[in-house]
């Protein structure tokens, strides 16, 4: 399949899951087990083949992004535990040049982080021009886990008068403004919520417990957070409603089938890069003469 065909197919696969306007979004309308027209077992090999072709196309587009050195791309991943963020990042980005990619995983904020505003640690890790930046969790934790567990807010050292009833509304506004600022400065933001079902999460947790090679992935806190499942779903839904925009859309990706999740994420990244009209820089006459002189010198020896 040619690159143009891959880009066209990628757009068709990503489009059903892209949210440009969050007002009418409802999480219940997204089936975590959805695979579009892919039949799970019969079409799984076809999906893996599509991902492999997509990885090759992505590598070509990233090379142009790096050479052109005009745009930066920021990919934000949010999800419940065991939804497959790490695997999606690993498989989709497997073919790109590490020199042009920056990956940051944001866990609980450090003491230094808490001495700054909540966007600080993410802002200082934004991708350079020509690079793809990946945030595995992000500033969105501030309207997710901090909202579900308000006690975390007390650790942020905010003046009491700034912690009012409108704090979440204010944070959504901050984030929208921040992402608009990035868009106006050539940083293309794309956000992914990998939507796994509670049932599938349970299965994956049990697999991590039963498989010695996966024990390291499991934390007892992962299981206890399931008690707050409904609270998290409400927080995710409002987060998407309040921060999905044309310049920084959310992709709400079904995550019960990892192979399908990876195809959709890969398709969205390809579609994003293809929309930037990337090309290798053209050299001027002076540079062409310089190249000709260098070639002549090399051939003469």
Description of each model-found segment:
Residues 1-301:
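Flexible, compositionally biased loop and terminal segments
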């Amino acid at each position: 399949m040619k690159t143009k065909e891959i880009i066209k197919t990628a757009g068709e696969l990503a489009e059903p899951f892209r949210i440009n306007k969050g007002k009418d979004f409802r999480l219940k309308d997204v089936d975590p087990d959805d695979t579009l027209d892919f039949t799970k077992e019969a079409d799984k090999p076809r999906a893996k083949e599509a991902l492999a072709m997509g990885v090759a196309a992505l590598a070509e587009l990233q090379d142009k992004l790096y050479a052109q050195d005009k745009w930066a791309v920021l990919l934000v991943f949010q999800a419940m535990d065991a939804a497959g963020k790490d695997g999606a990042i690993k498989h989709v980005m497997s073919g790109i040049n590490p020199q042009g990619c920056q990956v940051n995983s944001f866990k609980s904020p450090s003491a230094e982080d808490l001495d700054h505003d909540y966007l600080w640690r993410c802002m200082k890790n934004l991708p350079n021009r020509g690079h793809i930046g990946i945030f595995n969790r992000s500033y969105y934790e501030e309207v997710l886990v901090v909202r579900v567990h308000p006690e975390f807010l007390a650790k942020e050292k905010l003046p009491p008068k700034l912690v009012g009833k409108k704090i979440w509304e204010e944070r959504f506004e901050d984030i929208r403004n921040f992402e608009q600022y990035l868009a106006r400065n050539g940083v293309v933001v794309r956000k992914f919520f990998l939507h796994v079902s509670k049932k599938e999460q349970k299965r994956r947790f049990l697999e991590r417990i039963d498989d010695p090679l996966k024990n390291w992935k499991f934390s007892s806190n992962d299981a206890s957070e399931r008690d707050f499942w409904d609270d998290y779903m409400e927080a995710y839904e409002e987060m998407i409603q309040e921060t999905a925009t044309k310049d920084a859309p959310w992709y709400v990706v079904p995550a019960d089938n990892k192979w399908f999740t990876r195809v959709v994420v890969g398709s969205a990244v390809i579609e994003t890069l293809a929309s930037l009209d990337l090309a290798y820089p053209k050299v001027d006459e002076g540079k062409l003469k310089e190249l000709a002189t260098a070639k002549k010198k090399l051939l003469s020896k």
